[in-house]
From Swiss-Prot:
Protein name: LL-diaminopimelate aminotransferase
Modified residues (N6-(pyridoxal phosphate)lysine): 249
InterPro entries: Aminotransferase_I/II_large, DapL/ALD1, PyrdxlP-dep_Trfase, PyrdxlP-dep_Trfase_major, PyrdxlP-dep_Trfase_small
Positions annotated to bind pyridoxal 5'-phosphate: 72, 108-109, 132, 187, 218, 246-248, 257, 292
Keyword Transferase belongs to the record: yes
Protein residues bound to substrate: 15, 42, 109, 132, 187, 292, 388
Disulfide bond annotation, renumbered to this chain: none
Gene assigned in the entry: dapL
Length: 408
């Protein structure tokens, strides 16, 4: 009989969102007439920008002709999309990123997991707490952790608390780590990092020869012009950071699938024999072996994000969701709940009422208001006593959800 990867058996029972789905399905079975409003999983609801749809329709027409047909594309992405990303996402913000340092993919969730393919087994790893569960679970799956403790934390990982007491700012550790996961604007707390805070992280990484894995999937939601959108806005970050970005939330590509990862060519790691090796070449080799690229049609749609029409339409989408976030913040604050985030990110991070833990508040809102959110404890032990609501829904449903919650 074939042997399995035993590391999967160390995973806690049920990934957060499948557990939410299980509870919601049980409720819906028992209450088939209930009109549920889902503000849990961060999936967008508004249609794709028209510029992207038009570009994909043209690409489909191209593909129907002999001259315009495209088969396998470059595993790294088509040059015209990489050039547009470099110009508009990085060079426009004075970041020294070249098109060759950009790898187009089908999702930053995939990339933030798959990056472990090129990193060693013995790195000391730090994550923030609360944390996007994929960072932790992907390390568990490849055997980089020990067992789960009663607290929900895994042996072999170090956790940096982010809570109201420290202003949801991950404090720079005093001990050595090789690999650090950062996500700003943060999922799930909605907190942000200033340039000064990122400068301290880059300084730490350079002093410790550490690598920062920087998830900037929500950078487009930043409203404060003083806040950085990329870690590469910080001097020295090219030498110590990989950045993940996505078209999922800013342009609504959750079902269309397109993202990209940036690996500067100067970024180095060490081999088991202590030789310096550039990470760009390793990732390029990995992608060439395990990835066939994003479809031509989808990449044309992503390219259109950077057209004048696309930029205007994406800006309208961002404004729509951030207006939803403001409604959530103001309505919940009006009934005395403490609400964090929701100002530079599409997530509101709510302190649960006294006497309720995260899952109790989840069940309370599900039963009493028929509103689905995300329990903070599902993001780590420091998320206990908090609850996440997403701004990704229609205006009518957000208003109705707030009416229900403020009425119970």
């Amino acid at each position: 009989m074939v042997q399995i990867n035993g590391s999967y058996l160390k995973l806690k029972a049920g990934y957060l969102f499948p557990e939410i789905s299980r509870r919601v399905n049980d409720f819906s079975t028992a209450n088939p007439k209930a009109d549920l409003i889902r503000l849990g999983i961060g999936d967008v609801t508004e249609p794709l920008p028209k510029a992207c749809c038009n570009a994909m329709q043209l690409a489909i027409e191209e593909m129907s002709t002999e001259a315009g047909f495209h088969g396998y594309g470059p595993e790294q992405g088509y040059s015209w999309l990489r050039e547009a990303i470099a110009k508009f996402a990085y060079q426009a913000r004075n970041c020294e990123i070249t098109p060759e340092e950009i790898f187009v993919s089908d999702g930053s969730k995939c990339d933030s997991s798959n990056i472990l393919d090129i990193l060693g087994d013995n790195n000391r790893i730090a994550v923030t707490d609360p944390v996007y569960p994929v960072y932790v679970d992907s390390n568990v799956m490849v055997g980089r952790t020990g067992l789960a403790e009663k607290s929900g934390r895994y042996q072999g990982l170090s956790y940096i608390p982010m809570n109201a007491e420290n202003g949801f700012e991950a404090e720079i550790p005093s001990e050595h780590f090789d690999l650090i996961y950062l996500c700003f604007p943060n999922n799930p707390t909605g907190s942000v990092a200033t340039k000064e805070q990122l400068m301290r992280w880059v300084e730490y990484a350079k002093n410790h020869d550490a690598l920062i894995l920087f998830d900037a999937a929500y950078e487009a939601f930043i409203q404060d012009p003083e806040l950085p959108h990329s870690i590469y806005e910080i001097d020295g970050a090219r030498d110590c950071a990989i950045e993940f970005r996505s078209f999922s939330k800013n342009a609504g590509f959750t079902g269309t699938r397109c993202a990209f990862t940036v690996i500067p060519k100067c970024l180095r790691g060490r081999s088991p024999s202590n030789d310096e090796v550039d990470l760009w070449s390793l990732w390029n080799r990995r992608q060439s072996t395990k990835f066939n690229g994003v479809s031509y049609i989808v990449q044309r749609g992503a390219e259109a994000v950077y057209s004048p029409e696309g930029q205007s339409q994406v800006s309208d989408l961002i404004s729509f969701y951030m207006d939803n976030a403001q409604i959530i913040r103001s309505q919940l604050s009006s009934i005395g709940l403490q609400v964090y985030g929701g100002q530079n990110a599409p997530y509101a991070w709510i302190k649960t009422p006294e006497g309720m833990d995260s899952w109790a508040f989840f069940d309370y809102l599900l039963q009493k208001a028929n509103v689905v959110g995300t329990p903070g404890s599902g993001f780590g032990s420091s998320g206990e006593g908090y609850f996440r609501l997403s701004a990704f829904n229609s205006r009518n449903k957000v208003n109705e959800a707030m009416r229900r919650i403020t009425s119970i």
